[in-house]
Each structure stands twice: as C-alpha cells, then as structure tokens.
Amino acid sequence: MVVNVIGAGLAGSEVVYNLGKRGVKVRLYEMRPKKMTEVHKTGYFAELVCSNSFKSEEVTNAEGLLKAEMKMMGSVVLEVAERTRVPSGKALAVDRNAFARKVTEIIEDMENVEIVREEVTSFNPDEGIWIVATGPATSEGLLSFLKELLGEDFLFFFDAVSPIVSFESIDMSRAFWGDRFGKGNDYINCPLTQEEYEELWKALVEAEVIEMEDFDRSLLFERCQPVEEIARSGKDALRYGPLRPTGLVDPRTGKEPYAVVQLRREDKEGKFYSLVGFQTRLKWGEQKKVIQKIPCLRNAEIVRYGVMHRNIYINSPRVLDPFFRLKKHPSVFFAGQITGVEGYMESAASGIYVAYNVYRILRGLSPLRLPEETMMGALFSYIIEKVEGDLKPMYANFGLLPPLSVRVRNKFERRKRLAERAMKAMREFLEKNPW
C-alpha cells in the first residue's frame, strides 16, 4: 500500500522520512514551487517561514524536553538541525536555507518516496491512507474540499514574522555581542537610552499597519504578538518584553542599558540577522522608518521585511480521534500546525507521532497513545480531549504535564523531575512498543 502525504513542511517531512526509511512506499504531494503560498519563498521541504530558532535544548525547558523525546523516537528535523545550526546561545537555531535544502535532499534520495509537485484539491478518503500536513497556509482549493470532508469551517489566528537585516549594515561601534547573564556571545545587542527608547516607542505606536481582511486583535497568537501591538499596550511594555535589558551589560558603560534590541544570526556565514521579537504587520516603508530609530540600525539594509499572515487550523477535538485520524474517515490523518499544535517542534513532533501509528496500522497492530507523562503525549492529549469550546493553538509547556506525586516548591527542581519522569516514560514506552 502507498501512503499519501500532502504537504512537505516540518510535519510532512517527518512523516515521509520515518515511513520511508522503514520500507513503506510513500507518495508525497507538494505544490511548491509550482504554486507558492503567501509566506513561502522556495520550493524546499521544511522551509521555515518565521524565526530560524527551534528554541531551547535544555530539558528543564518545555521545548528542550520536547526535542529530547523527539530524538528518542527519531527525528530528521533535529538530525538536520544539528548539521546546519548557527550560534544562538542555549537555543537551537539553524541556517534556514541550508536546513531546508538538506531536508529536501534527504527525502529526494529516499528510494521508497515518490514526489509529486502538484497541488491537491481533492482525494478519495476511502482509497488508501492519506495524511494531510499542509500547515497554516493550506491552499484555497484544498481548503474547500477539506471543509466539505470535515463538515465544518476552519478556525484561524494571525501570526507575524520579523524583519532581517544585513550584518554589514549594522553599526557595530555601538552594538555589543553577548547573551543574557554572560552565557555566551551569540547575539548582537543594540542598546537604547531612555530617550532613544521613547522615540522608538512613539514611532511604533504612530506607524501605519497593513490592513488585513477579518483581522481581530483577539486572534493574535500570544507568542507572536506584533511589536506595534505590544507597544500600544503601554509605554514600558516593550522594555519588559522583547526589549528587556535584563542580564545584558553594555561593555562601554558597564551597566544594563535602558532597553535592548537583540539580533539573532540567520545563516552560518553570519551575513544576515533577524530582529528578535520584532514580528510586525507595519507597512514596509514604516518598518524602515521604525528600524532606523534604533541607533545601531540607522543605516540598516533590510533584506526581508516583516509580514503578517492568517494561519488556519481544524477544530481537532471535534473531528479527530486520539491518533489524529478523522472520526468520520479513519484512513485520513492530520499532522502539523493544521491540527492546532503551535510551533516548529510541536508540528514536527506531531508528524513523528502520526508516522509511528500509521506504521503500526500497516503492520496490523493497533495505534497507541504516548504516555501522558511525556511532553508529546500531554500535548496531543490536550489538543484532542482537554479543550472546552473552540481549540486555541497550544505549544509545549510544563503546565500540560500531570503533577508530580510529591510537591516540589523549587521551580527548576520541579521541572527537572518532570523532565526525568517524561524521558523515563518515553524510554519505557519505546522499549515495550518499538517502531
């Protein structure tokens, strides 16, 4: 039997890789580059359209624990991320082009994988296994078909990305290298005095935004709030948010600046840097004016402007079973952000989970849920079963995990124990139920 996968994002790539390497015949449909979305720039698989950061690798951080579990199950995304990483302190960040190019090469070289560069606008859910991993920018043609298949409309939220500037245009005479609390030198820090900060804040709140159809501030995703929306919530909101100076000492003064704009490397050569926390929907001309209010970026060359886009997803608790199959059509699976998980790693992890159970089904075995003590198990359980009302996108966090049997007051120690329990549960699960 051929397994059909629609969409070669992070989730789709994990599905294809994990099935293909186990001898399963896979037909992968990807419409890019023949038909592009409003946010993609290339035809590569696993293209990163927002940040180039996969966040923390420490297991006492929810994102780090999620990665540890993914590695235990097997993840092509993390394998390639290790090979294409760029310096980013305690976070795992990648050269976005090298990363996507390598994932594409690996999948293209797989003998069991047939790649079809065409848009899918419909399919027969009763013929074979179908895995929909088309992400938040699913094409209108397929959306129409899926609405009919699901019998209900999609949910959506708004997301935004940050601008990227060239390194050679940054004024390094004022900027300084460093991570918070002296834990590395991977970020470029652009310090602001109180006067400079207030000038930047004023420019942000007065800047014109690009109007969007159906735009609603309540539908902005909390971890990707546009910088201008944060600014409008109060004069000091940015200074206690993405521009907080905590743990960053300017070597010129020996003190923490009033505020700091951080820049994160985008590529291995260090030619391009993104503005951390500067997701925006400002008009492009306004973005340039605002960025030039930052002294270190007065002459900045903007190589990619920030944009906002609408992300769609299904109401998973209503339409999916615990294995991410359609309740109406058990041979149709969903994976990735279209299910309501939020984040790069969360999307990739859902692809691994779907691939695991599809492989079991193909071998005549029953699908299995992951232990709820694991971050993956708890996240997927939440998405499917633990939501009241309409689903809101959810990312990995320790609040999803069942509490420890004993109360631990110290936050770090509590997270450490939760992580140890999660990894033990995943290890035992995979020993008992290997791929």
UniProtKB/Swiss-Prot annotation:
Keywords: Cytoplasm, FAD, Flavoprotein, Methyltransferase, NAD, NADP, Transferase, tRNA processing. It comes from the Bacteria. It comes from Thermotoga neapolitana (strain ATCC 49049 / DSM 4359 / NBRC 107923 / NS-E). It catalyses: uridine(54) in tRNA + (6R)-5,10-methylene-5,6,7,8-tetrahydrofolate + NADH + H(+) = 5-methyluridine(54) in tRNA + (6S)-5,6,7,8-tetrahydrofolate + NAD(+); uridine(54) in tRNA + (6R)-5,10-methylene-5,6,7,8-tetrahydrofolate + NADPH + H(+) = 5-methyluridine(54) in tRNA + (6S)-5,6,7,8-tetrahydrofolate + NADP(+). Transmembrane segments: none annotated. Its cofactor is FAD. It is found in: Cytoplasm. GO terms for cellular component: cytosol. Belongs to the MnmG family. TrmFO subfamily. FAD binds at residues 7-12. The keyword Methyltransferase applies. Its EC number is 2.1.1.74. Gene3D superfamilies: FAD/NAD(P)-binding domain (3.50.50.60). Catalyzes the folate-dependent formation of 5-methyl-uridine at position 54 (M-5-U54) in all tRNAs. GO terms for molecular function: flavin adenine dinucleotide binding; tRNA (uracil(54)-C5)-methyltransferase activity, 5,10-methylenetetrahydrofolate-dependent. NCBIfam families: gid_trmFO, PRK05335.1. GO terms for biological process: tRNA methylation; tRNA wobble uridine modification. This is Methylenetetrahydrofolate--tRNA-(uracil-5-)-methyltransferase TrmFO. InterPro entries: FAD/NAD-bd_sf, MnmG-rel, MnmG_N, TrmFO.
